[in-house]
Amino acid sequence: MTSHTMVKVVGGWALAGGLSISLAAAQNGNSPGVTDNEIRIGNIMPYSGPASAYSSIGRVQEAYFRKINDEGGINGRKPKFISYDDGYSPPKAVEQARKLVENDDVLLIFSPLGTPSNTAIQKYLNSKKVPQLFVATGTAKFGDPKSFPWTMGWQPSFHSEGGIYAKYVLNHHPDGKIAVLCDRLK
């Protein structure tokens, strides 16, 4: 699968799930980030910095929300996708999360990218009861609803992915070599 196809697949599924949740919240119209004609959805993405290669994900998400708006929105409400650059810097991610919650009054934070940035904003968003949905990282700690009920991961854990890749290599390249890459966060 090419990276372009992967972005389209991941973006499409994540947006579909996020919009389903947004639709449910929009039904009552009295949630933060929801008005009679708008649903404000926040996003934090590394448009600059060392992970800027992933910025295409944010652009695809923005384009998809534009498409939804062009087709009439959700129950007459237009999603307003507000996406800020964190440069893949945890302190900047915290600043942008606060801006989205406290100034932009978003309903949720949708698909923020990266383990360091999501780690930095997780406690804040949960303390404010702002959904942190479809976290774009494979670190298993983003699948802990008892400790962080307002956070929901998206992709399989890095541990699970590693097992899948190892089985594939062993089955198809039994003499191959395997290198292990891992993050330092628990």
Could you tell me what each predicted segment is?
Residues F148-K186:
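An alpha-beta-alpha
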Residues Q61-N69:
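Short, well-ordered amphipathic alpha-helices
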